[in-house]
Amino acid sequence: MCHGKIAPKSSSEFVVTSVGHGVFLQLVILCALLGDGLASVCPLPPEPENGGYICHPRPCKDPLTAGSVIEYLCAEGYMLKGDYKYLTCKNGEWTPAMEVSCHLIEDKETHALGVPALSIVASTASSVALILLLVVLFVLLQPKLKSFHHSRREQGVSGDQVSIMVDGVQVALPSYEEAVYGSSGHCMPPADPRVQIVLSEGSAPSGRNMPREQQLQGQEACSSAGGEDEAPGHSGLCEAWGSQGSETVMVHQATTSSWVAGSGSSRPTHKDTADSENSDIQSLLSLTSEEYTDDIPLLKEA
């Protein structure tokens, strides 16, 4: 203090003092920052065998400070043990604390793939067995089917009647012969009886065998057709044929007897006999003409 006044300090001392305080403050701040930084840095995370980790956000910083997040991954064919796979750096430690490891998953895949494989093999085997069974059944039943078809065809050709059900009523279908030849079947219709009468009347003794031959031919036709199954009207027509043949023979015999009677009418000793024969001939002619007229509608109906 000089003359009652405070003497000022020197400027050099003030500068040194202020610099010393500033440096000390900076050192304290730096130490605090370094301490916090060292305390927030986490060590490298454990890396599992057959696996690794990635950082979020990428890329990984060095060092890994607080707030850094890592995700664990496993190699192909391996799976991470546990469901949680993320670790976070807090206060220099990784949380949550857990053991990270990767293990094989081939056993599970083999077991999972084994069931579909077995089902595929079983379905294939069953389908092949079914196809073989169908082939065997077809081979065994083919002869029976052929014989059944052949028998049905023979029934259709031979003329056996086949019936069907129409509204609960059994209706008989016509056979092949009935559909083609009518109800007469194979029996051929006889010749016109009037022509036979004319031939028998105009024929000489040399024509006596003609009606009998025609009758034999008609009987042979009826006998050949009688061996097969026929319609009900077939036998009736053949009987009419036989009756007409016999009537023709009778007419022929009557005409021949009339011819003999005419040649001997000049004899006076047999006059009464000739008259009786002429009356018999007239009755026979009238009878045969009536019967032939009755038979003609029958032929038209056939």
Swiss-Prot record:
A GO term from the CC aspect: membrane
Localisation per UniProt entry: Membrane
Reported phenotype of the disruption mutant: Mice are viable and fertile and do not show any notable developmental defect or spontaneous tumor development within 2 years. SUSD6 and TP53 double knockout mice show an increase in tumor development and a decrease in lifespan compared to TP53 knockout mice carrying wild-type SUSD6.
Ranges for domain Sushi: 40-104
Biased composition (Polar residues): 212-222, 256-267, 279-290
Pfam families: Sushi (PF00084)
InterPro entries: SUSD6 (IPR042866), Sushi/SCR/CCP_sf (IPR035976), Sushi_SCR_CCP_dom (IPR000436)
Positions of disulphide bridges: C42-C89, C74-C102
SUPFAM superfamilies: Complement control module/SCR domain (SSF57535)
Described purpose of this protein according to its UniProt entry: May play a role in growth-suppressive activity and cell death. May be involved in the production of chemokine molecules in umbilical vein endothelial cells (HUVECs) cultured in THP1 monocyte LPS-induced medium. Plays a role in preventing tumor onset.
PANTHER family membership: SUSHI DOMAIN-CONTAINING PROTEIN 6
Protein name stated in the entry: Sushi domain-containing protein 6
Gene source species: Mus musculus
Gene name of the record: Susd6
